[in-house]
UniProtKB/Swiss-Prot annotation:
Any one biological process term the GO annotation gives: RNA modification
Span list, region Type E motif: 421-496
NCBIfam families named among the record's database cross-references: PPR (TIGR00756)
Keywords annotated in UniProt: Repeat
Gene Ontology molecular-function annotations: RNA binding
Signal found in the keyword field: no
Name listed for the protein in its UniProt record: Pentatricopeptide repeat-containing protein At5g56310
PPR repeats: 77-114, 115-149, 150-180, 181-211, 214-248, 249-283, 284-314, 315-349, 350-380, 386-420
């Protein structure tokens, strides 16, 4: 390689060398040979050449060596500092972020001027370390250097403030901007979506000029609604997006399919699947995974299996999604067979896969198999069980009536049990009439979620099942005394791509009178046939 460079001019030689590194090798020995050649030929006197080399080193995963090269450069300019800061900002390591801040401060110490490319990289560091005070310092420096009118820099500042909890600062910056392009609008929309401020996001979308809105604008709001558990509103905004003839992209469709899955909206979900097929987007693994998830959660596990078998490419998420779907539908044997098939295919299960397969064992009652799988997580796959895995084990043992063993598992956990763990034990105590454990589980639940009526009702029912009517009555009176109300039941139905939700005792539905008329007619017809 060195001989080949000698035949070229020095600058073109380095370009060829960097390109060759990307193609032929990225080991440290090759990089050091390159660096030696740069020093011998004097190429290292040009900061542009050194920046290219640092970029090649960081892309090859040798950032420590890249930083060493940077620190030995006698007169690094702004471009070289930017290259080093950018490389460090891409790493998800606290040490790298502190080094990036040091590099930025060296830029100031050398009296070199930061430019519009410096600040977005440094703001990413502020986001990574969640340091709003450092971010505010950068904001002040942006103003000092006159870059507060740069859309590129302001967008970075808005993203930083949202990520660090400074919502008011982000909105103030936005409102004070005289010229706003679509990227600034979208940065604010994405920020509101990220923190769940969906009313603000919706208001901003309505305020946004229609000629500025693009598919990213709509997607920010749709995705925000979907992640905030407001699936109906996500679908409503998606339908408006289509009415305005804005083409959804892959990210949009992922969010909408997620909303359909949460609502169980099979009719609309199938329409979106047809759209995906028609647009030739069904080769995207992430979309196929979302389609499988939508069918499984909407009750059509057969269709979910059909899609799974038809896809050309599967990753761990694909396998986990179908295993979880089978488990949820009570097909424990099929879920286990799918898990074994996944392992034979050479796909390594992850922590979510084990939640799905342990859930399948729980539904079927395979206690011994569940224990073996749980133990294999650490011994075979190097996965440390988290609280959800322990929750699956408590559920598995509780359903099987092994309540004392479940209690021992809770005591052995490396972290404190949460409400889901104690709730599972309380439910199992109710089924298997274990009053002692039931009372202890409720006492823990009252500390964690004192207003959850379901917990009190479970213990009240346990007292009733054991014929202890006074304690059952006392439990219900206790609920009234502390103001805990029984959660109203609810149901839903999908009609013409719209999901209607009904809540027990709710009088706010716009067609409540007509609903009660129909119910009375149905009641009369039922009574006439009895």
């Amino acid at each position: 390689m060195i001989q080949r460079i000698n035949a070229l001019s020095l600058s073109s030689g380095l370009n060829w060398f960097v390109t060759s590194l990307k193609i032929h090798g990225n080991n440290l020995k090759t990089l050091k040979q390159s660096h030696c050649y740069m020093i011998i030929t004097g190429l290292n006197r040009d900061n542009l050449n050194v920046a290219k080399f640092i970029e090649a080193c960081s892309n090859a995963g040798h950032l420590r060596y890249a930083y060493s090269v940077f620190t030995h450069q006698p007169c690094p300019n702004t471009y070289l500092h930017n290259t080093m800061i950018r490389a460090l900002s891409l790493l998800d390591e606290p040490n790298a972020h502190s080094i990036a801040i040091t590099v930025y401060r060296k830029l100031w110490a050398l009296c070199a001027k930061p430019d519009t490319f410096t600040f977005p990289f440094v703001l990413k560091i502020a986001v990574r370390v969640s340091d709003v005070w450092f971010g505010r310092q950068i904001h002040g420096q942006v103003v000092v250097f006159g870059f507060d009118s740069s859309v590129h820099v302001v967008t970075g500042l808005i993203q930083m403030y949202f990520s660090c909890g400074g919502l008011g600062d982000a909105r103030k910056m936005f409102d004070e901007m005289l010229v706003k392009d679509v990227n600034v609008w979208n940065a604010l929309l994405a920020g509101y979506g990220k923190v769940g401020e969906m009313d603000e996001a919706r208001s901003l979308l309505e305020m946004m000029p229609c000629w500025v809105r693009n598919e990213v604008s709509w997607t920010c709001v749709i995705s925000g609604y979907a992640k905030s558990g407001r699936a109906s509103e996500a679908i409503e905004v998606f339908q408006r997006m289509l009415m305005e003839n804005v083409e959804p992209d892959e990210v949009t469709l992922l969010a909408v399919l997620s909303a359909c899955a949460d609502l169980g909206s099979l009719e609309l979900g199938e329409r979106i699947c047809s759209y995906v097929d028609h647009r030739g987007m069904n080769r995207a693994v992430s979309l196929n995974n979302a389609v499988i998830d939508m069918y499984a959660k909407s009750g059509n596990i057969t269709k979910a299996l059909d899609v799974f078998e038809c896809v050309n490419e599967r990753n761990v998420v694909t396998w986990t999604t179908i295993i979880a779907g089978l488990a949820t539908h009570g097909h424990g044997a099929e879920a286990l067979a799918m898990f074994n098939r996944m392992v034979k295919a050479g796909v390594r299960p992850n922590d979510v896969t084990f939640i799905a397969i342990l859930s399948a064992c729980s539904h079927v009652g395979w206690v011994d198999l569940g224990k073996r799988l749980f133990n294999s997580m650490r011994s075979k796959y190097g996965i440390h069980p988290n609280i959800e895995h322990y929750g699956c084990m408590i559920d598995l043992l509780g359903r099987a009536g092994k309540l004392r063993e479940a209690d021992e598992v809770i005591k052995s956990m490396p972290f404190k049990a949460n409400a889901a763990i104690w709730g599972s034990l309380l439910a199992a105590s109710n089924v298997h009439h274990d009053l002692e454990l039931g009372e202890r589980a409720l006492s823990e639940l009252i500390k964690l979620e004192p207003n959850n009526s379901g917990n009190y009702m479970l213990l009240a029912n346990l007292y009733s099942n054991l014929g202890r009517w006074d304690e059952s009555r006392m439990m219900r009176n206790m609920m009234k005394g502390i103001g805990v109300k029984k959660m109203a039941g609810e149901s839903s139905i999908e009609v013409e791509n719209r999901v209607y939700k009904f809540i027990s005792g709710d009088l706010t539905h716009p067609q409540v009178e007509r609903i009660h008329e129909i119910l009375q007619e149905m009641d009369l017809q039922i009574q006439s046939k009895v």
